[in-house]
Amino acid sequence: MARQLFTPPITNPRFDPNQSIRESYKNTTGGMQFQQNLHEDQNDNERSSCDGDENSTTGERLENNKSPILTKQEIDEALNTVTNLPPELSKLIDIFIDDLKQPKYVRPLSVLQLSSLFQSFYIKFDKASFQHVSSANNNGYYFSGGGSSSFLAAKETLSSGLSGIFGRSRSSSGNSLMRPRRSSSLFSNESISNSTNATQMLSPEEIKKQLKINELNNMKIEKYMELCERDVFKKILIVGTSVSSPNKMKTFKPHQLQTFKVGNLFRNSVEFTEYNKLLNEKILCLSKLSTMNKINLIKFLSLNNGIDPEPKFEEIKDILYEFTYHSISPCEKIKALLKLHEIMTYSQEMSNDDYLSLLIYYIITIVPRDIFLNAEFIRLFRYKKKLVETESFALTNLEAALVFVEGLTKNDFSNELQDKLTVNESKILENSISSRVSLPSKTAIMHKNNGNNGSNLGDIVTPTIQRPDVTRSNSYDGFRTVFDSSLKNIIGKIRSYTPPHPNNTSNNNLHSSNNLNIPRSSSQLSMELSNRDTTEMSRDGSRSTSSSSRSSASLEHGNREFTGDLTVTASINGADKKEFQKSWKKYKGYKFEDLTICELRDLFEIYQKMMQ
């Protein structure tokens, strides 16, 4: 019987099989490696005893270097000074608003097109804010040893990488072996001490300070973006949303509460306004049913027994009014929405279903008007780069609550309640709003990152509105309008003509022998005759009655001449005339937009034959 070999069990818990395999296939370079491994194995127990302390110390060091902790005092000192935009950034807003007010578009912009313009402006303003903060903090970079080195210049210039390889001498002399070599390590102390071109590296304290400066700069840029949204819509509140009319600037008293009507931005998008109108009617209808005790909202929405909506009712009401009526910019509205979310969260164990049920209860009970347009206003006009994480979560919850309300029908209630509904209430609750009004699709259009910047870690990909092409006056539509009017002018000249009186045949022949037989309209003839009479009046100094009678007679003669020539042509080509009439009358019931290119070419050829 053959002897079987067994591998003894591994008793050391620190034994790593993968490391054993790697060490087994590694080339032996000498006894130093084995001694080093033996020394590490002997001191393994000592290292394991202090692993926890070392890991915690290293973690704290990395945490301090990568994400510096800013105190509240440092943040307040940096942001309290930023109350208004700098003049160069405020000028960008003025230019943007003035550009929107220019009548340079063929038709009024829809809310989706307007949103695309705002998002493009936000990206440009964000870049301009970064440049402004960078230029303002050029002297804020940390300098060490009186040198002119910056954070990005803290590296070795000639002693690292390929430059260190190609910088060496190719001489084969024996002394070159003893010469100190340039190190290829980025953090080599030898290269710093030996190389005169090396730049002093930043210490951990200097790196930490620079990271704090960068974090404060990012906060300043975010503050500038909030002020940008505020100032843009405050100026729109003053100048309006129509084409520029400087004489109709709105003025507000100091104590007057400014109210921004979000619906003005959606007036060119009928789908949104109609959807909002129907949703307002349905919310009001449900509120009346609840007030008349026809439905029990708490029972219908299955609110948790531990949640009582009444104690915070007035506070929630004030926040919803602030959200819908008194806030202006998207950042102000989203702050009110976040505050609403914070107040409604009773405990950490509260599920999202309980939160949605409570939010629906407050919406139906308080009845804030145009809440749908306010939610869409945030979705469209809030800077996409900022509408992430908690902001996106709060807005999505509000949209989910509104979707639940718009989908309610009378079939969702009991038969007893359906019998008590009036005709108007039954009509409102007949169908869902989405089945009656179709909004522009958002699901097929995925979020595009702003500009060419990489997406930050933690950003949530959110559906957004595609940037539709904005039609300008020099577009294809403008060309089609011009072509439309010119061709209609040509077709309008094709009219039936009455034959002249037979007594005027001799006069026509006499007149045709002296003039070229070019068909002209009566308006052209009258202009020529009036110009000729004016010339005669300037020569004689006065205009006689015979001259005016002669002009009217000449005009009548010209008209008969024109129709007479066409009559002669038509009598010669009688068969062709019938064919022409039959060919172009078949387009009598057509609209210009319905004609194809071939049919337009056919009409043009008919016109050319008529003019021959």
Curated annotation (Swiss-Prot):
Family matches, as Gene3D superfamilies: VPS9 domain
Domain VPS9: 273-414
Residue ranges, compositional bias (Basic and acidic residues): 40-50, 530-542
Pfam short name (any one): VPS9
Residues carrying Phosphoserine: S67, S163, S185, S245
Comp. bias regions, Polar residues: 55-66, 518-529
Protein localization: Cytoplasm
Keyword Ribonucleoprotein: no
Chain residue ranges for the region called Disordered: 40-66, 494-560
UniProt entry keywords in alphabetical sequence: Cytoplasm, GTPase activation, Phosphoprotein
Molecular-function annotations in GO: GTPase activator activity; guanyl-nucleotide exchange factor activity; small GTPase binding
GO biological process: Golgi to endosome transport; late endosome to vacuole transport via multivesicular body sorting pathway; protein localization to endosome
Gene Ontology cellular-component annotations: cytoplasm; cytosol; endocytic vesicle
Disulphide bond pairs: none
Primary localisation category: cytoplasm
Feature: compositional bias, Low complexity: 503-517, 543-554
Function as written in the Swiss-Prot or TrEMBL entry: Putative GTPase-activating protein.
Protein name: Protein MUK1
Organism: Saccharomyces cerevisiae (strain ATCC 204508 / S288c) (Baker's yeast)
Record lineage: Eukaryota, Fungi, Dikarya, Ascomycota, Saccharomycotina
